[in-house]
């Protein structure tokens, strides 16, 4: 049961209340905690591919799910016997249309401009059209959800159990009351203001999460109640700052309200304090902590830096691959595929392309001639060369013999003015060479 405190007989302020911990619009528990059997008769069901949010570089970006449409709710399960849904979408808050930006065929999306976009894909065009019609009718005919009802839920972020907040330890309130009594006995002129400043300091020192700040403020309120009675007995004026929060305030509204309460209470304190007290109070303000950056923004920054690092590593690997270098910087031997690619590469200048092509053909011709010459030298250097071996070699290298004969016929006849003997000038014909061997 919640107790209330009346201040100046005008407003009722709750002293202790269980905070509402909201995660993606949960009211009591997640609607994904329902099995396929418990859903009963479905309006439409079947296997669909769902695009992953954080797909790795080489893994598959689409995963197959058993999807069930029940009224205005869309559930997807890992299999037909699953006890809990992997995801849930409340369709009246979303729009359904084809996803032309996806490379996968038969894809459609369920999107919301301010919440999220889900991508699904069917096996064929017929299934995609059936799902689009069913989802479109569910979006149009059903009424929009209330603000307290969840819009979507997924299994990537586990649902926290909604448990009652544990009360603060008793020794904390005792120590705060003891310090308050010591301060009232030592400096009676600052009794009321010290208590209000302690509650204000607890209000300003708010961490990034909202429920913890609520608990701190509620812990300080009972201490201020105890201080009110002591201050009234002494007849001192009391300055008390009360901040009433809405059930679900925005983060900007929290900071704005804190700043306003801090400014108003500070002006009241400075008017009632002397110069020495104001100097000490300003020194205390210097030590006030500033709320940290929200946890969500930190996670987004980490993800962005990670993506940029992955992109840099990918670029570095591709540049090493293009330069035929190993990750350690060593020269990597070229493969046949890379050599073939390098041969196909062409320059924009046609004259240079012709010259390069001619050089490549001459190099290949030179290699062939060197190979033929090595075969002929191997035959002539054989000390055990016989007619039978020559005939076998001739049958095996018929093309080489024909090439030699053609070159001899195409070569110009030697002049008579040479000093070579007459019998050497006449080249022997092929039949005579064969007969002599």
Curated annotation (Swiss-Prot):
UniProt KW Membrane keyword: yes
A Pfam family matched in the record: PH
Coiled coil location: none
InterPro entries: CNKSR, PH-like_dom_sf, PH_domain
Domain of life of the organism encoding this protein: Eukaryota
Region feature Disordered, mapped onto this chain: 143-225, 273-307, 406-437
Presence of the UniProt keyword Lipid biosynthesis in the record: no
Domain PH: 41-140
SMART domains xref list: PH
GO annotations of cellular component type: cytoplasm; plasma membrane
Keyword tags: Cell membrane, Cytoplasm, Membrane, Phosphoprotein
UniProt region (CRAC domain), positions on chain: 315-320, 339-348
GO biological process: oxygen transport; response to oxidative stress
PROSITE patterns: PH_DOMAIN
Recorded GO MF terms: oxygen carrier activity; peroxidase activity
Subcellular compartments: Cytoplasm; Cell membrane
Compositional bias (Low complexity): 172-200, 273-283
UniProt subunit comment: Interacts with guanine-nucleotide exchange factors PSCD1, PSCD2, PSCD3 and PSCD4. Interacts (via C-terminus) with cytohesin-2 CYTH2.
Stated role: Enhances the promotion of guanine-nucleotide exchange by PSCD2 on ARF6 in a concentration-dependent manner.
Descriptive protein name: Interactor protein for cytohesin exchange factors 1
Organism: Homo sapiens
Phylogenetic lineage: Eukaryota, Metazoa, Chordata, Craniata, Vertebrata
Protein's gene: IPCEF1
